[in-house]
Amino acid sequence: MTTSNFRKCFAIVILSLLYITSCKKKSDDLPAEEIKTNCIQGISSVKKVLFIGIDGCRTDALLAAHSPALDDLMQQGLVNFHTDRGPYTVSCPGWSTLLHGVWPNKHGVTSNDISNLNYGKFEDIFHYMRLHNPGYSLASISNWDNFLRLTTEEDYAQTANSDAEVKDKALYVLNNCTPDVLLLHFDKVDEEGHNSGFSPQNPYYLHAIQEVGDYVQTIMETIRYREQTLGEKWMVVVVTDHGGNGTGHGGQDDLPETRYVFQILKVPGLPHSELANASNVDILPSIFKYMEIQPDSSWEWDGIPLF
């Protein structure tokens, strides 16, 4: 290898490392306020919400993966397989839209660099839940550390080293405090897409989706037990922040396989149906409708309930 070629390769490696570290911060770097351990009992004895985020999960790959748990939720719930996730096809803008109920022109997040994050008046799901009732028990678990920076005011907020650990911590929370809203973020599918390709023809990518489905199955077994024995009624939301093409997804606003995603909402008392004209800003209004919370007009949400 010539000196010139070596320098080019070295530069590419350094730039790649800088990109990765800007997106995936280690938990040791998280501010102390992002790690919270208060596992307190939920106040709602019946209505509760399980919000599941599967990072970087293409719709056609989800359908090709044939996960029994995810298939069951699709067959029982409200579904849309052509949901507009909006512009800026990377994770932080996508999750900010889902968790804040507004598009990037309001929440201001347009990249994964959130070192100067400032949502201003456009707060997150947990803040608005607290406004309605300060006593709500709220929990968030993710194995991508930046995810915990997108919300505030949880009682329990924990990072994990793997999707399996997200599942284990979710079971701990369900069995020890049963929050009113439990937010889970699984990151392995996105990681596998970057490693080997976002494609329904990629067996490694499909396996990552199936693996998450297995974890969801275990969690849903606990949810069903609680519903049958304690009379709880759980709304279950399953969404993603973006799809992908090749081994990437950034800057792909015009690619359908990246921009258009899925929504699955299992709502107690509602039969299966396919939704039309859904977008990711509709998730928060739908959750709040189920929890019988009337949004204030000052929140300026961009979406409407899907039922």
Residue ranges of each PLM-predicted region?
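Sec-dependent bacterial lipoprotein signal peptides
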Residues: M1-S22
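Bacterial Sec-dependent N-terminal signal peptides
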Residues: Y19-V46
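Metal-dependent active-site segment of extracytoplasmic phospho-/sulfohydrolases and closely related
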Residues: L50-F51, A69, E211-Q252, I287
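Short, structured active-site-proximal loop/turn typified by the sulfatase FGly-forming signature C/S-X-P-X-R
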Residues: D60-G94, G101-V102
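A short beta-strand-to-alpha-helix junction
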Residues: P87, N112-F122, P203-Q210, L270-M291, ...
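Substrate-binding rim/cap in mid-to-C-terminal beta-strand-loop elements of soluble/periplasmic
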Residues: P93-G101, D253-Q294
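Catalytic-site neighborhoods of secreted/periplasmic enzymes
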Residues: K106-V166
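Active-site His/acidic residue clusters
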Residues: L148-Q158, L171-D214, T218
